[in-house]
């Protein structure tokens, strides 16, 4: 029985938010429904990017949104998304509202057309703080 439980745990996606600082500042989180990656690379014209990869293809829709539910609830929308199969990406010069949404709320939901993927934020705050510290420091 213990072997089955161990195998089941290995087959499920990691539930923790993960921060890395190389080659660019990045924080990511994977669930059974998809993966969210936030990155900062000052070498790019639009240094901030958020990419949400679903288990299915995203629809072609005019507006992409991120809804943050919790104590500092907000919804952010844009028409600057790029859909590439199962991944929708948005790049910009600044992501202050996105960082605040991820750090200070309970869930983040990516919205495009009729599709929505939610990500729990219960362990996100420390990793978002590390991301903020990374973007404040120069990348070698």
Regions found by a protein language model. Give the residues of each.
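Residue-level marker of intrinsically disordered, low-complexity segments enriched
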Residues: 2-3, 81
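Sec-dependent N-terminal signal peptides
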Residues: 3-12
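A generic "folded-domain core" signal
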Residues: 15-140
